[in-house]
Protein backbone atom coordinates (compact mmCIF):
# COMPACT_ATOMS: atom_id res chain seq x y z
CA UNK A 1 0.00 0.00 0.00
CA UNK A 2 1.22 3.48 -0.91
CA UNK A 3 0.41 6.79 0.79
CA UNK A 4 0.57 9.81 -1.52
CA UNK A 5 0.11 13.48 -0.72
CA UNK A 6 0.55 14.72 -4.28
CA UNK A 7 -2.18 14.81 -6.91
CA UNK A 8 0.35 14.00 -9.66
CA UNK A 9 1.40 10.73 -7.94
CA UNK A 10 -2.21 9.52 -7.67
CA UNK A 11 -2.91 10.39 -11.30
CA UNK A 12 0.24 8.62 -12.47
CA UNK A 13 -0.63 5.47 -10.48
CA UNK A 14 -4.26 5.32 -11.65
CA UNK A 15 -3.21 5.96 -15.26
CA UNK A 16 -0.90 2.92 -15.08
CA UNK A 17 -3.72 0.78 -13.66
CA UNK A 18 -6.12 1.85 -16.38
CA UNK A 19 -3.52 1.06 -19.04
CA UNK A 20 -3.79 -2.52 -17.76
CA UNK A 21 -7.63 -2.37 -17.93
CA UNK A 22 -7.91 -2.54 -14.13
CA UNK A 23 -11.03 -1.11 -12.46
CA UNK A 24 -10.73 1.43 -9.65
CA UNK A 25 -12.95 1.73 -6.57
CA UNK A 26 -12.78 4.91 -4.49
CA UNK A 27 -13.77 5.69 -0.90
CA UNK A 28 -13.54 9.40 0.00
CA UNK A 29 -13.19 10.01 3.76
CA UNK A 30 -12.13 12.60 6.31
CA UNK A 31 -10.15 9.97 8.20
CA UNK A 32 -10.46 8.70 11.77
CA UNK A 33 -11.74 5.53 10.14
CA UNK A 34 -14.10 3.07 11.82
CA UNK A 35 -16.11 -0.04 10.90
CA UNK A 36 -18.49 2.06 8.82
CA UNK A 37 -15.63 3.19 6.59
CA UNK A 38 -14.27 -0.36 6.52
CA UNK A 39 -17.60 -1.61 5.15
CA UNK A 40 -17.24 0.86 2.25
CA UNK A 41 -13.65 -0.27 1.64
CA UNK A 42 -14.76 -3.93 1.74
CA UNK A 43 -17.45 -3.23 -0.87
CA UNK A 44 -14.91 -1.43 -3.06
CA UNK A 45 -12.39 -4.26 -2.66
CA UNK A 46 -15.00 -6.83 -3.66
CA UNK A 47 -16.12 -5.00 -6.81
CA UNK A 48 -12.87 -3.52 -8.18
CA UNK A 49 -9.31 -4.51 -9.08
CA UNK A 50 -7.76 -1.58 -7.21
CA UNK A 51 -8.95 0.58 -4.29
CA UNK A 52 -8.08 4.19 -3.43
CA UNK A 53 -9.07 5.81 -0.12
CA UNK A 54 -8.74 9.56 0.34
CA UNK A 55 -8.15 10.95 3.83
CA UNK A 56 -8.69 14.70 3.80
CA UNK A 57 -10.31 16.85 6.47
CA UNK A 58 -11.84 19.29 4.01
CA UNK A 59 -11.81 22.83 5.47
CA UNK A 60 -14.34 24.01 2.90
CA UNK A 61 -17.22 21.98 4.36
CA UNK A 62 -16.86 23.32 7.91
CA UNK A 63 -18.72 26.45 8.99
CA UNK A 64 -17.00 29.25 10.97
CA UNK A 65 -18.11 27.89 14.37
CA UNK A 66 -17.75 24.20 13.55
CA UNK A 67 -15.20 21.60 14.66
CA UNK A 68 -12.49 21.77 11.97
CA UNK A 69 -9.59 22.24 14.42
CA UNK A 70 -10.85 19.59 16.86
CA UNK A 71 -11.99 17.03 14.24
CA UNK A 72 -10.24 13.76 15.22
CA UNK A 73 -7.22 12.68 13.18
CA UNK A 74 -5.05 9.54 13.39
CA UNK A 75 -3.26 8.72 10.13
CA UNK A 76 -1.25 5.81 11.58
CA UNK A 77 -4.38 4.04 12.80
CA UNK A 78 -6.18 4.81 9.52
CA UNK A 79 -3.27 3.42 7.48
CA UNK A 80 -3.30 0.17 9.46
CA UNK A 81 -7.04 -0.27 8.90
CA UNK A 82 -6.65 0.46 5.18
CA UNK A 83 -3.71 -1.90 4.72
CA UNK A 84 -5.51 -4.72 6.54
CA UNK A 85 -8.58 -4.13 4.34
CA UNK A 86 -6.55 -4.38 1.13
CA UNK A 87 -6.39 -0.73 0.06
CA UNK A 88 -3.83 -0.04 -2.68
CA UNK A 89 -3.40 3.74 -2.32
CA UNK A 90 -4.23 6.30 0.37
CA UNK A 91 -4.44 9.86 -0.95
CA UNK A 92 -3.68 12.17 1.98
CA UNK A 93 -3.15 15.71 0.67
CA UNK A 94 -2.51 18.89 2.60
CA UNK A 95 -5.14 21.64 2.13
CA UNK A 96 -2.60 23.60 0.03
CA UNK A 97 -2.43 20.71 -2.45
CA UNK A 98 -6.20 20.79 -2.95
CA UNK A 99 -6.80 24.55 -2.76
CA UNK A 100 -4.31 27.05 -4.19
CA UNK A 101 -4.39 30.64 -2.89
CA UNK A 102 -6.15 31.65 -6.13
CA UNK A 103 -8.87 28.98 -5.77
CA UNK A 104 -12.32 30.44 -6.56
CA UNK A 105 -14.39 27.72 -8.32
CA UNK A 106 -17.21 25.95 -6.47
CA UNK A 107 -19.99 23.46 -7.12
CA UNK A 108 -23.35 24.79 -5.96
CA UNK A 109 -26.77 23.20 -6.05
CA UNK A 110 -30.33 24.39 -5.56
CA UNK A 111 -33.01 22.33 -3.83
CA UNK A 112 -31.27 19.25 -2.47
CA UNK A 113 -28.95 21.25 -0.21
CA UNK A 114 -31.49 23.62 1.38
CA UNK A 115 -33.30 21.10 3.60
CA UNK A 116 -32.08 18.90 6.49
CA UNK A 117 -28.39 19.59 7.25
CA UNK A 118 -28.33 22.42 4.70
CA UNK A 119 -30.75 24.51 6.78
CA UNK A 120 -28.33 25.00 9.67
CA UNK A 121 -25.11 24.40 7.70
CA UNK A 122 -25.67 26.58 4.60
CA UNK A 123 -22.12 26.31 3.17
CA UNK A 124 -21.55 22.65 4.06
CA UNK A 125 -22.71 20.97 0.86
CA UNK A 126 -20.98 23.47 -1.41
CA UNK A 127 -17.76 22.35 0.29
CA UNK A 128 -18.66 18.66 0.03
CA UNK A 129 -19.62 18.80 -3.65
CA UNK A 130 -16.57 20.84 -4.61
CA UNK A 131 -14.06 18.54 -2.91
CA UNK A 132 -15.77 15.35 -4.11
CA UNK A 133 -15.81 16.56 -7.72
CA UNK A 134 -12.11 17.47 -7.42
CA UNK A 135 -11.38 14.01 -5.99
CA UNK A 136 -13.31 12.35 -8.82
CA UNK A 137 -11.18 14.27 -11.35
CA UNK A 138 -7.98 13.27 -9.53
CA UNK A 139 -8.75 9.58 -8.93
CA UNK A 140 -11.03 8.97 -11.98
CA UNK A 141 -12.65 5.93 -10.31
CA UNK A 142 -15.07 3.53 -11.94
CA UNK A 143 -17.09 3.35 -8.72
CA UNK A 144 -17.24 5.49 -5.58
CA UNK A 145 -18.69 4.37 -2.24
CA UNK A 146 -20.67 6.45 0.26
CA UNK A 147 -22.48 5.49 3.47
CA UNK A 148 -26.23 5.85 3.92
CA UNK A 149 -25.66 7.49 7.32
CA UNK A 150 -24.93 10.70 5.41
CA UNK A 151 -28.04 10.15 3.31
CA UNK A 152 -28.42 13.75 2.14
CA UNK A 153 -24.77 13.77 1.05
CA UNK A 154 -25.39 10.54 -0.90
CA UNK A 155 -28.40 12.09 -2.67
CA UNK A 156 -26.46 15.29 -3.42
CA UNK A 157 -23.47 13.41 -4.88
CA UNK A 158 -25.75 11.24 -7.03
CA UNK A 159 -27.46 14.36 -8.38
CA UNK A 160 -24.14 16.15 -9.04
CA UNK A 161 -22.76 13.16 -10.94
CA UNK A 162 -25.92 12.98 -13.07
CA UNK A 163 -26.17 16.72 -13.72
CA UNK A 164 -22.47 17.20 -14.54
CA UNK A 165 -22.05 13.94 -16.53
CA UNK A 166 -19.32 12.57 -14.29
CA UNK A 167 -18.37 9.08 -15.46
CA UNK A 168 -18.50 7.28 -12.10
CA UNK A 169 -21.00 4.89 -10.56
CA UNK A 170 -22.12 5.97 -7.07
CA UNK A 171 -22.72 3.10 -4.64
CA UNK A 172 -24.64 3.69 -1.40
CA UNK A 173 -23.79 1.31 1.46
CA UNK A 174 -25.86 0.48 4.59
CA UNK A 175 -25.37 2.20 7.96
CA UNK A 176 -23.00 0.30 10.26
CA UNK A 177 -23.99 0.39 13.93
CA UNK A 178 -22.46 -0.33 17.31
CA UNK A 179 -23.88 -3.39 19.11
CA UNK A 180 -26.28 -1.15 21.05
CA UNK A 181 -27.61 0.50 17.88
CA UNK A 182 -25.70 3.80 17.73
CA UNK A 183 -24.67 4.63 14.17
CA UNK A 184 -20.88 4.54 13.88
CA UNK A 185 -19.40 8.02 13.47
CA UNK A 186 -16.01 9.67 13.97
CA UNK A 187 -17.82 12.26 16.10
CA UNK A 188 -18.90 9.60 18.63
CA UNK A 189 -15.43 10.06 20.14
CA UNK A 190 -16.54 13.50 21.40
CA UNK A 191 -19.14 11.92 23.72
CA UNK A 192 -18.45 11.30 27.41
CA UNK A 193 -19.92 8.20 29.09
CA UNK A 194 -23.20 9.89 30.02
CA UNK A 195 -23.61 11.43 26.55
CA UNK A 196 -22.73 8.13 24.87
CA UNK A 197 -25.63 6.50 26.73
CA UNK A 198 -27.94 9.41 25.89
CA UNK A 199 -27.01 9.17 22.18
CA UNK A 200 -28.91 5.87 21.94
CA UNK A 201 -32.07 7.97 21.76
CA UNK A 202 -31.35 8.52 18.04
CA UNK A 203 -31.53 4.87 17.02
CA UNK A 204 -34.26 4.17 19.59
CA UNK A 205 -36.54 6.92 18.26
CA UNK A 206 -35.97 5.89 14.64
CA UNK A 207 -36.83 2.30 15.55
CA UNK A 208 -40.22 3.53 16.82
CA UNK A 209 -40.74 5.45 13.58
CA UNK A 210 -39.77 2.44 11.51
CA UNK A 211 -42.17 0.20 13.45
CA UNK A 212 -44.99 2.68 12.84
CA UNK A 213 -44.27 2.68 9.09
CA UNK A 214 -44.14 -1.14 9.09
CA UNK A 215 -47.65 -1.17 10.58
CA UNK A 216 -48.88 0.83 7.59
CA UNK A 217 -48.71 4.44 8.82
CA UNK A 218 -48.69 6.80 5.82
CA UNK A 219 -48.71 10.17 7.60
CA UNK A 220 -45.28 11.82 7.74
CA UNK A 221 -46.50 14.00 10.63
CA UNK A 222 -47.45 10.95 12.70
CA UNK A 223 -44.03 9.39 12.16
CA UNK A 224 -42.24 12.66 13.00
CA UNK A 225 -44.38 13.00 16.14
CA UNK A 226 -43.47 9.59 17.58
CA UNK A 227 -39.76 10.19 16.87
CA UNK A 228 -39.80 13.72 18.31
CA UNK A 229 -41.61 12.66 21.49
CA UNK A 230 -39.06 9.91 22.14
CA UNK A 231 -36.09 12.25 21.65
CA UNK A 232 -37.65 14.88 23.92
CA UNK A 233 -37.65 12.37 26.79
CA UNK A 234 -33.83 12.53 26.84
CA UNK A 235 -32.61 15.54 28.88
CA UNK A 236 -29.21 15.72 27.13
CA UNK A 237 -30.76 15.75 23.65
CA UNK A 238 -31.62 18.86 21.67
CA UNK A 239 -33.32 18.38 18.30
CA UNK A 240 -31.84 20.08 15.24
CA UNK A 241 -34.38 18.47 12.90
CA UNK A 242 -36.75 15.53 12.49
CA UNK A 243 -37.81 15.37 8.84
CA UNK A 244 -39.48 13.13 6.28
CA UNK A 245 -38.38 13.87 2.71
CA UNK A 246 -38.31 12.36 -0.76
CA UNK A 247 -34.91 10.63 -0.91
CA UNK A 248 -34.18 11.63 -4.51
CA UNK A 249 -35.07 15.32 -4.25
CA UNK A 250 -34.71 15.95 -0.46
CA UNK A 251 -38.01 17.84 -0.49
CA UNK A 252 -40.46 17.45 2.42
CA UNK A 253 -43.32 15.02 1.87
CA UNK A 254 -46.56 14.59 3.80
CA UNK A 255 -47.04 10.96 2.80
CA UNK A 256 -44.87 7.93 3.51
CA UNK A 257 -44.28 6.10 0.24
CA UNK A 258 -41.50 4.52 -1.78
CA UNK A 259 -38.03 6.12 -1.59
CA UNK A 260 -38.77 8.27 1.45
CA UNK A 261 -36.00 9.30 3.84
CA UNK A 262 -36.75 9.70 7.55
CA UNK A 263 -33.80 11.70 8.91
CA UNK A 264 -32.86 13.24 12.23
CA UNK A 265 -30.08 15.47 13.57
CA UNK A 266 -29.74 15.77 17.34
CA UNK A 267 -27.28 17.53 19.61
CA UNK A 268 -26.12 15.35 22.49
CA UNK A 269 -24.40 17.93 24.67
CA UNK A 270 -22.31 19.87 22.15
CA UNK A 271 -21.99 17.00 19.68
CA UNK A 272 -24.27 16.94 16.64
CA UNK A 273 -25.20 13.42 15.52
CA UNK A 274 -27.28 12.28 12.54
CA UNK A 275 -29.15 9.08 11.75
CA UNK A 276 -31.89 7.94 9.38
CA UNK A 277 -33.76 5.16 7.69
CA UNK A 278 -35.06 4.85 4.13
CA UNK A 279 -38.50 3.49 3.29
CA UNK A 280 -37.86 1.36 0.21
CA UNK A 281 -41.45 0.42 -0.61
Language model feature labels by segment:
Residues 1-2, 281:
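Short, Lys/Arg-enriched, disordered terminal segments
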Amino acid sequence: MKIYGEIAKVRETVKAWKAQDLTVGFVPTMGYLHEGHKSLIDAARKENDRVVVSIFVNPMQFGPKEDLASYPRDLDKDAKLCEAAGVDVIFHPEPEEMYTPQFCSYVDMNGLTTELCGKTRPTHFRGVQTVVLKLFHIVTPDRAYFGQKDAQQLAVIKRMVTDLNVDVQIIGCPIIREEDGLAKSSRNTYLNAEERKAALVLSRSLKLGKELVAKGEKSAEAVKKVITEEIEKEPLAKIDYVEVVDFDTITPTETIGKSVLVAIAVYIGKTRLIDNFIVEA
